[in-house]
Design a protein with these regions (language model features):
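N-terminal targeting leaders characterized by basic, low-complexity, disordered sequences
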Residues: 1-39
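Basic/polar, cationic surfaces and motifs that engage anionic cell-wall
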Residues: 2-3, 40-43, 48-52, 63-87, ...
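Generic cytosolic/nucleocytoplasmic N-terminal low-complexity/intrinsically disordered segments
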Residues: 8, 17, 37-38, 72-74, ...
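A generic alpha-helix propensity feature with a strong bias for hydrophobic helices
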Residues: 11-13, 22-24, 90, 97, ...
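Compositionally biased, intrinsically disordered/low-complexity regions enriched for serine, proline
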Residues: 16-18, 22, 30-33, 74-77, ...
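Intrinsically disordered, low-complexity segments enriched in small/polar residues
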Residues: 28, 35, 44, 70, ...
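Hydrophobic core
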Residues: 57-62
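Active-site-adjacent loop/helix surface patches within enzyme catalytic domains
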Residues: 79-209
Length: 250
């Protein structure tokens, strides 16, 4: 029996036929290089790039938070035990009373006052007792009282106090100022109290990164002759110079 085999004829490519695309070359490691713009972040190189971008964003965010805390309203309020050898007694007014509204703010000013109370015994401790009673029902408060030997701290520096008489005016004494009362009691040493107030002012300016141009008088915010003795004597510029001298020591 004879079996016949018919061989298939070879296929001829048409002269107009397009060549079949070749597969993409593989790298030495046997992997094809990633296609640009497609699933790039799914590749090792893409993941490294993404990680680098995330790190850059995190570093920038941390730097921004640090700047805000350093320069903004979130800076922790100071609570010194002493300032250049002058003892500081912290005795905050209770939260929720009329004289402590609890409004947090950015510190922009240190506002200088005098108590206006020349009576014997009207020192810093006496004014601390007074403000703890008065602030229960009245919108009256300040941050520090200073006499010739000590300082009382009545409110956190980052909270509003009612001392400047300008309500909550933007960039005002109440909203953005730390109120310091200087005692003028006749049985005290006024000049030494002023010197201690200069030390405290220098400390606060240094802590909050402010210059002496941020020292204000009560009378800068409303029409009131305060600090009266200092203003009447034309001694405020000398007070600012004294503050600068203490700042230079810090």
């Amino acid at each position: 029996m004879t079996i016949l085999f018919t061989l298939p004829k070879p296929r001829r490519r048409s002269p107009t036929a397009k060549p079949r695309p070749r597969t993409r070359p593989r790298s030495a490691a046997g992997r094809r290089p990633p296609r640009p713009g497609k699933n790039f972040f799914h590749t090792p190189a893409g993941r490294r790039t993404l990680l680098a971008l995330i790190l850059v964003v995190l570093v920038a965010a941390m730097a921004g938070v640090s700047w805000w805390r350093y320069n903004g309203k979130n800076k922790e309020p100071s609570q010194p035990d002493e300032v250049l050898g002058v003892p500081v007694h912290t005795d905050y007014l209770p939260e929720g009373i009329e004289g402590r509204p609890g409004i947090q703010r950015q510190v922009k000013w240190v506002v200088i006052h005098e108590t206006g109370n020349p009576a014997a015994g009207s020192n810093a401790a006496a004014h601390n007792t007074y403000i703890h009673k008065k602030a229960q029902t009245d919108s009256l408060s300040w941050h520090y009282t200073v006499d010739e030997s000590e300082i009382y701290h009545h409110l956190p520096d980052n909270e509003v106090a009612w001392h400047a008489g300008d309500k909550l005016t933007k960039n005002g004494g109440n909203l953005n100022g730390i109120g310091i009362e200087i005692c003028i009691n006749e049985d005290g040493n006024y000049d030494q109290a002023v010197d201690n107030a200069a030390k405290l002012t220098a400390y606060l300016l240094h802590y909050y990164k402010l210059g002496t141009d941020h020292i204000k008088q009560h009378g800068d915010f409303i029409s009131k002759n305060c600090p009266e003795i200092m203003r009447n004597a034309g001694a405020f510029p000398a007070f600012v110079q004294k503050v600068q001298g203490y700042l230079d020591q810090m």
